Amino acid sequence: MTSIIKVDNIQNTSGTTAATIDNNGHVNLPGSNHITGFYNNATFTVSSGSFTYMTNWTKMNSTHFGFPNVGTEFSHSGGNFTTTKPGIYRVTLELHMNSANDARWIDIRLLFTPNGGSPVGGDLYDHVGVVSNDTTYHTAHRIRYFNFTHANDKVQIGTQTVAALNIRGGSNEYDTVIYFEWVGPPVT
């Protein structure tokens, strides 16, 4: 037996729309669609031997690179990324860097701090090519899943290196970015 249900909206008994279907068949789940992007708005210099948090982030929007955020957005303040919507998030970080020093490596940490506790995240190193009086460029990627269950949960990005290098960024550059994508409800 085949049945066809024709609807434009699906709502719960209180009237909150859980899903809509447009004329092209695209399904929108307003309670589940959430993605926020940020870009590094200035070149960030990582000094030799010192662990440093990155703080130069600007939220993307339709003016900045045509990326409108969807749903409940993340916010940023002083190197801390937070959200008001609990859930499991896929966090994707891409760093573009350059160095004219013999940096050899960079430690890039995506740190998650649950509800005011201690940061969780390991040392993740990338090799940076040794140069001889020339500039070397490198791209590093990190993807992590974090379970946000409290309003005080936060993500930070920390770096250190053996010799100074620059993480690229600027108001007209789309080089270094971080995205937060909601993938499911929180696990408690």
Show the residue positions of the predicted features.
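Short, surface-exposed charged micro-motifs
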Residues: 18-20, 80, 145
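Residue-level signal for glycine
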Residues: 15, 116-117
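Beta-strand-rich receptor-binding modules of extracellular spikes/adhesins
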Residues: 2-30, 161-163
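Beta-strand signatures of extracellular beta-sandwich domains
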Residues: 107-111, 156
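Extracellular beta-strand-rich recognition modules
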Residues: 87-97, 138-143, 152-161
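A generic beta-sheet turn/junction motif
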Residues: 14, 148-150, 173
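Glycine-rich strand-loop-strand elements at beta-sheet edges
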Residues: 74-77, 117-151
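Terminal (often C-terminal
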Residues: 23-103, 112, 127-128, 165-188
